[in-house]
Amino acid sequence: MLQKYLWYKNNNLTGFKSNFEEVFNPLIFGMISPLFKKNIWS
């Protein structure tokens, strides 16, 4: 499992990073921006 992960990490780090950012940035901003809006407008 660990070797497979390390191999994947070494071979696909840039691709994985871009996929990670594509998936998680919208989720993170989707969760954070409503909090900021509440803090700003309340």
Curated annotation (Swiss-Prot):
The keyword Plastid applies. One of its GO terms (cellular component) is chloroplast. It comes from the Eukaryota. Keywords: Chloroplast, Plastid. The keyword Chloroplast applies. It is found in: Plastid, Chloroplast. This is Uncharacterized 5.1 kDa protein in psbE-petL intergenic region. It comes from Marchantia polymorpha.
